[in-house]
Design a protein with these regions (language model features):
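A short, Lys/Arg-rich alpha-helix, primarily the initiator
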Residues: 2-23, 61
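Short alpha-helical DNA-recognition segment
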Residues: 25-43
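Short, charged recognition helix plus adjacent turn
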Residues: 7, 69-95
Length: 95
């Protein structure tokens, strides 16, 4: 759980977490269990108090990649948008 400043022009990671949960239909508790973290960690990420660790970001990216294979067009489109916004340069660009 790394505390990083957001780079200018970079979308906040809290948006990424909320959107991924919305796309997957998972509660904060369910999302936490999927990533192997505590519920309070997800809550802190979404509220901008903490940033996900590099390992968590890797897992989040894998979840988004899996959604790009969905038969549901909206899931594919939204997951691709999030991948481009947050992971187009590298995991270290997420902030």
């Amino acid at each position: 759980m790394v505390k990083n400043k957001v780079a200018p022009g970079q979308p906040k990671v809290s948006h990424l977490i909320r959107e991924l949960r919305r796309l997957t239909g998972l509660s904060q508790e369910q999302f936490a269990a999927t990533l192997g973290v505590a519920f309070s960690t997800i809550n802190r990420w979404e509220n901008g108090h903490m940033q996900p660790s590099p390992l968590a970001l890797k897992q989040i990216k894998m979840m988004l990649n899996e959604l790009t294979c969905s038969p549901v067009v909206e899931l594919v489109e939204q997951s691709q948008i999030l991948l481009v916004q947050y992971f187009s340069l590298s995991e270290s660009s997420v902030g």
